[in-house]
Design a protein with these regions (language model features):
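The conserved Walker
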Residues: 43-47
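Conserved pre-motif I regulatory segment
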Residues: 1-42, 154
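Short hydrophobic/aromatic beta-strand immediately N-terminal to the Walker A/P-loop
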Residues: 40-42, 77, 182
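Conserved nucleic-acid-binding Ia/Ib motif block in the N-terminal RecA-like helicase ATPase lobe
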Residues: 3, 9-12, 19, 69-139, ...
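Post-DEXD/H (motif II) to motif III coupling segment of the RecA-like Helicase ATP-binding lobe
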Residues: 144-197
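Walker A/P-loop NTP-binding motif
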Residues: 27-39, 50-70, 87, 92-96, ...
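Hydrophobic beta-strand core positions in alpha/beta domains
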Residues: 54, 78-80, 128, 161, ...
Length: 197
């Protein structure tokens, strides 16, 4: 039985995908003390963390609605260390948020910049991308994060290891202080804990 605390569109998507129970990391983000708050989660690849952060940010994105309206600027941002992971995350969020009508844009190196800009201009609710390409869109004024409600840092320890932390911090400076932050990392180095604050 899927938890009653999950937003209805997401619960329907999980049920349609055959989910009967949630993983430990997915249950953790539903805990009352985690609702609407910043979360720092130690999670390995394969633990169901993409669905977990999709659930964690749902209240911020949906704001009590079952369907999303047009968004002038993104409501949620997911930063991932690699193009492959970003594309995988986008695919997962697409089915999870499909019945809510979420428009998801992917911004990653090696892809056509103009296509990404068009997707952003059409009103993306969720943007998934890599640090360098996201920063490029910010610098070119094609990505406005002023209305962001939630930010997710996926595999934050990998971003640290790959030297992306300065880009991540610069991206987060463009977002409102009131945003919810969900940070997922297999390990928790001190630099990761600093970003979480």
């Amino acid at each position: 039985m899927i938890d009653q605390a999950i937003a209805a569109p997401l619960a329907a998507a999980l049920t349609a995908k055959g989910y009967e129970t949630l993983t430990a990391v997915q249950q953790a983000v539903l805990a009352p003390e985690a609702q609407g708050r910043d979360v720092l989660v130690s999670a390995q690849t394969g633990s169901g963390k993409t669905v977990a952060f999709g659930i964690a940010i749902a209240d911020q994105i949906l704001a009590g609605q079952d369907k999303l309206l047009y968004a002038d600027s993104p409501l949620a941002l997911v930063i991932a260390p690699t193009r492959e992971l970003a594309l995988q995350v986008a695919r997962e969020l697409e089915w999870l948020y499909a019945s809510a009508g979420a428009q998801i844009a992917t911004c990653v190196g090696g892809m056509d910049y103009r296509s990404e800009k068009r997707a952003l201009d059409r009103g993306a609710h969720i943007v998934v991308g890599t640090p360098g390409r996201l920063r490029d869109h910010i610098d070119r004024k094609s990505l406005d994060l002023s209305g962001l409600r939630a930010a997710v840092l996926d595999e934050a320890d990998e971003m640290l290891r790959m030297g992306f932390i300065d880009d991540v911090e610069r991206i987060l400076q463009e977002t409102p202080d009131s945003r919810q932050t969900a940070l997922f990392s297999a390990t928790m180095p001190s630099a990761i804990k600093r970003i979480a604050k």
